[in-house]
Swiss-Prot record:
Biased segments, Basic and acidic residues type: 19-29
Lineage, uppermost ranks: Eukaryota, Viridiplantae, Streptophyta, Embryophyta, Tracheophyta
GO molecular function, one term: ubiquitin protein ligase activity
Name listed for the protein in its UniProt record: U-box domain-containing protein 40
ARM repeat locations: 260-299, 301-340, 342-381, 383-420, 422-464
Superkingdom of origin organism: Eukaryota
Segments of skewed composition (Low complexity): 38-52
Keywords: Repeat, Transferase, Ubl conjugation pathway
Function: Functions as an E3 ubiquitin ligase.
The species this protein was found in: Arabidopsis thaliana
Domain U-box: 57-127
InterPro entries, sorted: ARM-like (IPR011989), ARM-type_fold (IPR016024), Armadillo (IPR000225), Ubox_domain (IPR003613), Znf_RING/FYVE/PHD (IPR013083)
Matching Gene3D superfamilies: Leucine-rich Repeat Variant, Zinc/RING finger domain, C3HC4 (zinc finger)
PANTHER family: U BOX DOMAIN-CONTAINING, U-BOX DOMAIN-CONTAINING PROTEIN 40
Length: 550
């Protein structure tokens, strides 16, 4: 018993020691886990801070100029700016004009910018932006209106009245605006083709080639609302039977071709929506008739912007790319007709209408090439489209067509627009535009006066800045001789432009003669010890790269 007590005491002490060791281990583990938790939290917080980009890191083009936040639903307006959709709607509702003042007349979804923003957010592990609701947008615009006093805006009716006074002549016209001049349904693609002077350019270009207007008397105006017959046509357009759809399309095509007032009454949101769904039909006859109907509807000036805003341009571009031959003819006519409206020019370029037109101007039928060329002429009146044409390689292609005598008159009209723009002018100089124009002028007996005048207009545009590069290229191509001929025997406007180009070139010749005829005292020059300054003087430039003394 005495021996067992010490053993029991040892066992108790040992168990207490084990408990204390276990307790200390638990405390140490708990402490380590706390450190791990705190470290993980700090690291996660730091990583989250790193993943959330600041406003300075967000690309400026992703931010709405009005709200200053990342755009969830960006749209592009006629002036070329991109905004959040809700902000634009609020501005139009409240009559607010931000700075710089944009053009909100045409609103197009900017899908490319939207996808770019989402891709950027995914790469940065940043949540994509949510669309701004209308209430928040109006609250934001009201706050901006309080800061910026607004001038009294002219109402829409007043704008239309003022514009009508400016546009309409004082004489009474008996024909519609779209009936100013009939263009032929074919053209001669050789170098002998006849092109009207630039003063009559717009008279050539008021109708697509695929439209032929019948001779008819004055037609009574229809009611603005759809009649029961028109409602029946709309019902047939939505039918599941192809025969009924074709019957309705042929009927609408005939009505809108004869009755001008029906173009307005039938150009409603419901009708355009039904036509839009039929453009991509797999039946060629349906596609042809739909595009023909759109040609007729687009002839009315008030319908042009409405048709573009309906979103019908992208499917038309698809037809230009892969539709039937006849459908391509009509689609080119629709694009040309819509491009006559200034508000549509930027939108058509943004939606990708330039590239298929450039393709069809070379390989399409005569009607397609004709309307494609005139569509490109009107679209190239906008600077943003001229920049796109340069990127698409249009300058080299168009100059090649001029050299080969293909559609030379219509192509020169496009090149005149390109030569007048500082964005596209360098591309013309790089691609041999000066030499090409002088070469056409040398074919004096083969080209008509309009073609010669267009060539001189291109040279005049290229000489606008009076750069040494143009002067050198013109002198190398011996342009002076051909311009002198135009100055003596050309039309009055061609004479004036040729005279101005010659003044630029003659100034270059006089400068060169002055340098060549200058007497130089070489002995005095060598004794002066200032050779570098004399070298700069001899070079005719203010500074010289190799100006070190020798």
């Amino acid at each position: 018993m005495e021996i067992q007590r010490p053993v029991i005491n040892l066992m108790v002490l040992h168990s207490q020691h084990d408990k204390s060791d276990n307790l200390s281990r638990r405390e140490s583990l708990a402490g380590k886990s706390k450190w791990r938790t705190s470290l993980s939290r700090s690291s996660s917080s730091s990583s989250s801070n790193n993943n959330s980009p600041t406003k300075t890191e967000i690309p400026a083009e992703f931010l709405c100029p009005i709200s200053g936040s990342l755009m969830a639903d960006p749209i592009i307006v006629s002036s070329g700016h991109s905004y959040e959709r809700a902000c634009v709607i609020a501005c139009k509702t409240l009559g607010f004009t931000p700075t710089p003042p944009p053009d909100f007349s045409t609103v197009i979804p900017n899908l490319a910018l939207k996808s770019a923003i989402h891709s950027w957010c995914e790469r940065r592990c940043f949540p994509p932006p949510k669309p701004l609701n209308s209430a928040a947008a109006e609250k934001l615009i009201l706050a901006l209106m309080e800061k910026k006093p607004q001038r009294r805006k002219v109402s829409v009716s007043e704008k239309e009245l003022i514009q009508a006074i400016r546009d309409k002549p004082s004489v009474r016209l008996n024909h519609a605006a779209t009936e100013l001049d009939r263009r032929p349904n074919y053209f001669n693609s050789s170098s002998d083709e006849s092109i009207a002077s630039s003063s009559r350019t717009l008279q050539l270009t008021t109708k697509p080639s695929c439209f032929s207007s019948p001779s008819s008397g004055e037609i009574e105006s229809l009611e603005p609302n759809l009649t029961p017959e028109e409602e029946a046509l709309l019902t047939k357009l939505k039918s599941n039977r192809i025969s009924e759809i074709e019957e309705a399309l042929i009927s609408i095509r005939r009505i809108t071709r004869i009755d001008e007032s029906s173009r307005i009454s039938l150009c409603t949101t419901r009708v355009i929506s039904a036509l839009k769904s039929l453009i991509v039909s797999r039946y060629a006859t349906v596609q042809v008739n739909v595009t023909a109907v759109l040609v007729n509807l687009s002839l009315e000036k008030s319908n042009k912007v409405k048709i573009v805003r309906s979103g019908i341009v992208p499917p038309l571009i698809d037809v230009l790319k892969c539709g039937s031959v006849e459908a391509q003819e009509h689609s080119a006519g629709v694009i040309f007709s819509l491009a006559l409206e200034d508000e549509n020019k930027t939108a058509i370029g943004v939606l990708g209408g330039l590239e298929p037109l450039l393709h069809l101007i070379r390989v399409g039928t005569e009607l397609t090439r004709h309307d494609s060329a005139l569509a490109l002429y009107h679209l190239s009146l906008v600077q943003s489209n001229r920049g796109k044409l340069v990127k698409l390689g249009a300058v080299q292609m168009l100059l090649g067509m001029v050299s080969l005598g293909q559609m030379i008159g219509r192509v020169l009209l496009i090149l005149c627009n390109m030569a007048s723009c500082p964005v596209s002018r360098p591309a013309l100089l790089d691609s041999g535009g000066v030499e090409c124009m002088v070469g056409v002028l040398r074919r004096d007996r083969e080209v008509n006066e309009s073609t010669r005048e267009s060539c001189v207009a291109v040279l005049y545009g290229l000489s606008h800045d009076g750069g040494l590069r143009f002067k050198g290229l013109a002198m190398a191509a011996n342009a002076v001789e051909e311009l002198v001929k135009v100055e003596r025997s050309g039309r009055e406007r061609a004479k004036q432009k040729a005279r101005r180009v010659l003044e630029v070139l003659r100034a270059k010749i006089e400068d060169d003669d002055l340098v060549e005829n200058e007497e130089i005292d070489w002995e005095e020059l060598l004794n002066s010890g200032d050779v570098s300054r004399s070298r700069c003087r001899l070079g005719g430039e203010k500074s010289c790269v190799n100006s070190a003394e020798f």
